[in-house]
Design a protein with these regions (language model features):
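Hydrophobic "anchor" residues on beta-strands that sit immediately upstream
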Residues: 5, 79-80, 160-161
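Phosphate-binding glycine-rich loop
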Residues: 32-80, 94-96, 104-106, 132, ...
Length: 383
């Protein structure tokens, strides 16, 4: 009998790192420096070296990281932040926290990332609504960087800040630049299912600005000044936990190896499925970390395909079934242009297959064979 197939196999990674992680966590516990202990600084320094950036500041989670970046920019009510609608809610949620307005833009059909061609339309939408455009949040969805040459040019010309929401794409590269070297800020999430994940919640902000880094370190610690009981700004409580930092140090040590393993899994999927279904595409000179491996299937048959794969013990997931502009909490916010048709279409078609560095070839062959059998048996499923 075939063992259960994990959508993301965290147990396999834990087994590989068990001794090192347990030793690191125990050392953090025994040090009794549970808040901003030395492991936090060590992790921040090692992650900065990994990115090739000047500063990494750990936070409690990736959502807080976005919020703190916006706070660092002084975002307030009346400001507009341009962001894609086809993403997890955290991207726009942090904007709404501050009373600012997210302006939703459509995505590129192939990459699922923000379509740079929509940015001028979003800018006009913001100005027509009497809002002050302040920043663009680009999301590195499913592990692939956004099209940053075009996005950076737009932000530079319009004097807008650029925040790279790399919760899913941290560790990816865009034309020789690793995430963390792009934009004014890069935010990371270390939620356990992310390519670089901890054993709870965690996040980070990457920046090359000394001035911004100083403000961020203050904001994550209640807006403190030189002393923790001196408060120079309104901040929040969002510090990376010492034990999680200790775990992340060990995970970072094997991260490059896992990125390569994820690419090997993606290559096998591509080879086995490209002729029967629309497989993911990565932009030239870019490298994805493959947080998800996402197909596009006919929306009339997606549920049937998922059910058939489930009957064979193969888990699947839909990221995301509904764009943010169609969700109750975000319907009141503006969209650029006459709706977001590409986002709406993608939401009806996307289907993600199991993806993690420890997906062995035999199991993956079984998944590929099962998908092919389902698709070839129902030609209308394939896009």
């Amino acid at each position: 009998m075939r063992p259960p197939i994990e959508f993301i196999d965290l147990k396999a990674q834990q087994h590989r790192l068990a001794g090192a992680v347990q030793k690191a966590a125990l050392a953090a516990i025994e040090s009794a420096q549970y808040i901003l202990g030395p492991q936090v600084t060590e992790f921040e320094e090692k992650l900065a070296a990994f990115c090739g950036a000047r500063h990494v500041i750990g936070t409690a989670n990736g959502t807080d990281a976005i919020g703190i970046c916006l706070m660092t920019l002084g975002v307030r009510p009346g400001d507009a932040i341009i962001c894609p609608a086809f993403t997890f809610a955290a991207t726009a949620e942090a904007v709404a926290w501050l009373g600012a307005t997210p302006i939703f833009v459509d995505i590129d059909e192939d990459s699922f990332n923000l379509d740079p061609a929509q940015l001028p339309i979003a800018l006009d939408t913001a100005k027509r609504a009497g809002l002050k455009p302040r920043a663009v949040i680009a999301v590195d969805l499913f592990g692939q960087p956004a099209d940053y040459d075009a996005i950076e040019n737009f932000c530079r010309n319009e004097k807008l800040a650029l925040i790279c929401d790399s919760a899913q794409g941290f560790g990816a590269t865009y034309k020789g630049r690793r995430t963390g070297q792009i934009g004014d800020f890069t935010t990371a999430s270390f939620f356990p299912a992310k390519p670089l994940g901890c054993y709870g919640d965690g996040g980070a902000i990457v920046t090359n600005s000394d001035e911004s880094a100083e403000i961020i370190r203050s904001l994550r610690f209640h807006g403190k000044g030189d002393d923790k009981y001196e408060h120079v700004r309104i901040g929040m409580n969002s510090r990376l936990d010492t034990i999680q930092a200790a775990i992340l140090i060990e995970k970072l040590a094997i991260f490059e190896d896992e990125i390569a393993a994820r690419q090997a899994v993606a290559n096998r999927y591509d080879a086995g499925l490209h002729d029967v279904v629309k497989t993911p595409s990565v932009m030239p000179d870019c490298r994805s970390v493959w947080a998800q491996y996402t197909l596009r299937v006919d929306p009339r048959r997606r549920s049937a395909l998922m059910a058939e794969l489930k009957s064979k013990g193969i888990p699947t997931a839909v990221y995301y079934p509904k764009p943010l502009n169609e969700q109750e909490a975000y319907r009141r916010f503006p969209v650029a242009g006459n709706g977001l048709p590409t986002s709406t279409q993608a939401a009806s078609e996307v289907l993600s297959l199991p993806m993690h560095p420890y997906l062995d070839a035999d199991t993956q062959d079984y998944i590929i064979e099962s998908v092919r059998e389902a698709l070839l048996g129902r030609q209308s499923i394939a896009v």
